[in-house]
Regions:
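An alpha-helical support segment within catalytic cores of ATP-dependent transferases
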Residues: 65-138, 151
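Helix-rich C-terminal or lid/interface subdomains of diverse kinases
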Residues: 2-3, 33-36, 99, 114, ...
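Short, solvent-exposed loop/turn segments at secondary-structure junctions
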Residues: 29-33, 41-43, 98, 144-146, ...
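Structured catalytic cores of enzymes that bind and process phosphorylated ligands/cofactors
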Residues: 8, 14, 23-27, 59-63, ...
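Generic structural signal for hydrophobic residues
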Residues: 9-12, 122, 183
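Active-site Asp-x-Gly
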Residues: 82, 87-94, 103, 135-138, ...
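ATP-binding pocket architecture of kinase catalytic cores
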Residues: 1-91
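Residues in soluble alpha-helical coiled-coils and helical-bundle/repeat scaffolds
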Residues: 21, 44, 106, 110, ...
Length: 183
């Protein structure tokens, strides 16, 4: 079956909206179009960490699973993310997140032997750098500043999820990329 990003986004929003109340509701969708509830967004985030925002992330992360992955593939940008379940976080992260991005980047422009050797070393030894078996928790999956809606310095909600069950510290790491870091 050919991956359809619109269907995937709709399924992801349906899943999240059955459990949480800060993702846009689906108004209508088909394989070519997804119409969701409008969230007013002036991009004006609070100068201090917003508790509603942090509590919402915590609510996402309280939903857990026995395995790492998700019931269907999702996406980040134009990249389809395989979410086939695995019982080990290091394997899931290496096989389903890092390796595909590495292969895509290397196919676009060969990074050379030195960089390829270093990346392959990291991929083969990832279990030495990250926990093997943290509790699989639901993640937004694409949590960056553009997917967090603020209006009038108040948290409104999240958009554009690429959800899967993974290690929640991955999402915290995304938030550290903010300028300035948000947590």
């Amino acid at each position: 079956r050919i991956f359809n990003p619109i269907e995937s986004e709709a399924k992801n929003l349906q899943y999240l909206n059955e459990r949480l109340n800060f993702f846009p509701k689906i108004i209508n969708f088909n394989k070519n179009c997804l119409i969701v509830e409008f969230y007013k967004n002036d991009g004006n985030k609070p100068t201090n960490t917003n508790l509603d925002f942090l509590e919402s992330i915590i609510k996402i992360h309280t939903i857990s699973n026995n395995l790492f992955g998700f019931g269907f593939n999702t996406q980040i940008g134009a990249l389809e993310q395989s979410n086939k379940y695995e019982n080990n976080w290091a394997n899931f992260y290496s096989n389903k997140r890092l390796s595909p991005i590495f292969e895509l980047a290397n196919n676009k422009e060969n990074m050379g032997n030195f960089i390829n050797e270093k990346i392959n070393y990291i991929l083969k030894n990832i279990k030495n750098f990250i926990p093997n078996n943290p509790s699989p928790q639901l993640l937004h999956g694409d949590l960056w500043e553009g997917n967090i809606i603020f209006n009038n310095k108040k948290f409104v909600g999240f958009i554009d999820p690429g959800s899967f069950f993974g290690h929640n510290e991955m999402e915290v790491a995304y938030l550290r990329w903010f300028d300035p870091p948000f947590v």
